[in-house]
Amino acid sequence: MKLFILAVGHKMPGWIASGFDEYAKRMPPELRIELREIKPELRSGGRSAESVMAAERQKIDAALPKGARIVALDERGRDWTTMQLAQALPGWQQDGRDVAFVIGGADGLDPELKARADLLLRISSMTLPHGMVRVLLAEQLYRAWSITQNHPYHRA
């Protein structure tokens, strides 16, 4: 099984890439994290947020690994603790399907994609920069894995 983070947005600051890479490289070979950046749609010419999200959904769909479990990050998603994420990981691994975490663009995720998702998950009740979400998600995935392995990284 592989973990994918599909993120609408590109040209992130260097510290975002460094932070993401730090946690991604810590993951074990059997649970690698791959980042797939989706170029955002331009909001020009009077385009509505709905049309922008629909166009971004098409790009996300093209980048989704076939048969992957879709975890859409959304402010109205379920509010999991790190322990709940750690409890989900072994089941996902046994299932054998790749897991794709999807981070939307400035307008969020298209409702059709959210309706298809296996899980709607909220990273925080606070509004966060999209680049920061990549780093936080990678760290939480590493922390969840470390919990499943009784690794000393997580000290609760």
Swiss-Prot record:
Name of the protein? Ribosomal RNA large subunit methyltransferase H
PANTHER family to which the protein is assigned, alphabetical: METHYLTRANSFERASE (PTHR33603), RIBOSOMAL RNA LARGE SUBUNIT METHYLTRANSFERASE H (PTHR33603:SF1)
Q: Which UniProt keywords apply?
A: Cytoplasm, Methyltransferase, rRNA processing, S-adenosyl-L-methionine, Transferase
Q: What does this protein do?
A: Specifically methylates the pseudouridine at position 1915 (m3Psi1915) in 23S rRNA.
Predominantly, its location class is cytoplasm
Subunit composition and interactions: Homodimer.
Q: Does the keyword ATP-binding apply?
A: no
Alphabetized InterPro entries for the sequence? Alpha/beta_knot_MTases, RlmH-like, tRNA_m1G_MTases_N
**From which source organism is this entry?**
Burkholderia multivorans (strain ATCC 17616 / 249)
Q: Does the keyword S-adenosyl-L-methionine apply?
A: yes
The record ties this protein, via SUPFAM superfamilies, to: alpha/beta knot
Taxonomic lineage of this organism?
A: Bacteria, Pseudomonadati, Pseudomonadota, Betaproteobacteria, Burkholderiales
Q: Where in the cell is it found?
A: Cytoplasm
Residues bound to S-adenosyl-L-methionine are 73, 104, 123-128
- Gene Ontology CC terms: cytoplasm
Which EC numbers characterise this protein's activity in its record? Answer: 2.1.1.177
Q: Which family does it belong to?
A: Belongs to the RNA methyltransferase RlmH family.
